[in-house]
Amino acid sequence: PMTEAERTDFIRGIRSQTDKLDFLFQALVKTSRLETGVIQLDKKLGRLFDTVAQAMSGIVYAAEKKGIAVSVDCPEDLTVFHDSKWTSEALFNLLDNAVKYTPAGGKIAVSVVLWEMYVEIKVTDTGKGISESNQAAIFRRFYREEEVHEQQGVGIGLYLAREIVTRQGGYIKVVSEPG
């Protein structure tokens, strides 16, 4: 028979694995629906600040837990045509990666700048960086760098982010240097 402590650890492990499976399932469903056109992006004029805030709310706890300082520079009154739900999903995926790969005590910054022809949303962090040879690959479905297999993930978040941004007429890229 199991002790109470063993039972608690066992249940905690089951919950953790269930959460991972749920995350994978949800990511695959979202990707599939987006790719097959089941979900149509619904671009409307809306405040980008609210979309950024929604994405940020999903990573605040994990960032605090690692002691990562998070800052946002986004004009509150900036309105643009975008699908706020899916844009928030794309931004969350970028931020989630930033939290995963930024060491404890690091920094993550989100800045939003209105240019003449487009709006730039930039996520910067003090993470380990991505080698130039891997930069194009990180947006492929299921791609994961060899060195990051200790981190939780399935390699779908950045692919989904790229799909969402591209389907709204946007462009996503990475600028990084290892270290």
How does the language model describe each region?
Residues S16-L21:
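Short alpha-helical segment of the dimerization/phosphotransfer core of two-component systems
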Residues D42-L45, E64, A69-T79:
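Conserved catalytic submotifs in the C-terminal HATPase_c
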Residues D42-S57, S71, V113:
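A conserved beta-strand-to-alpha-helix junction within the catalytic ATP-binding
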Residues G105-M117:
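Short beta-strand/loop element within the Bergerat-fold HATPase_c
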